[in-house]
């Protein structure tokens, strides 16, 4: 049985919502075990609450060592100046031991993200994230254009061939759209299908 981990960091809930729909898509594939976890918050709780960070999230916090237990990992992060959030970077910077063992070599790595604006760095966030995954020897999987949501021109929407994305709005008030969530589900299903084939 293939094991898929959806691992995310979410400040205000947008990436958390996307992660839940990626899980939904992955779970639609028979014979795949799907786990949802998040990386630790690095901002002190009192300060995080003061700036509106969603501190209380249902997903348990992951440990670095458990990454080796999965056949595929789908990472989710908000954008910080065109790169992944510091919380995710801090977590990944602790994976040196896994790298030394080659523990993630040959496993699937996939990424989804959120940005504040339409051109706020969603693609650079995902592609720069890929660098770390490639150093670990992971096999990168994105979202193929077989996903019809990628060519939706009827609205302003996230979604790239590199991975699912959502636009949060400059003030965080915009929630993931139906199209963005469809793309997220597609990514989860696509990764789970490939993980199942590789694990068989």
Swiss-Prot record:
Keyword list (alphabetical) reads: Flavoprotein, FMN, NAD, NADP, Nucleotide-binding, Oxidoreductase
Q: One Pfam match, by short name?
A: FMN_red
Protein name per the record = NAD(P)H dehydrogenase (quinone)
Quote the InterPro entries the UniProt record gives. Answer: Flavodoxin/NO_synth (IPR008254), Flavoprotein-like_sf (IPR029039), Flavoprotein_WrbA-like (IPR010089), FMN_Rdtase-like_dom (IPR005025), NQO (IPR037513)
UniProt cross-references to NCBIfam families, sorted A to Z? flav_wrbA, PRK03767.1
Q: Which residues form the Flavodoxin-like domain?
A: 4-191
Name the PANTHER family for this protein: FLAVODOXIN-RELATED PROTEIN WRBA-RELATED (PTHR30546), FLAVOPROTEIN-LIKE PROTEIN YCP4-RELATED (PTHR30546:SF23)
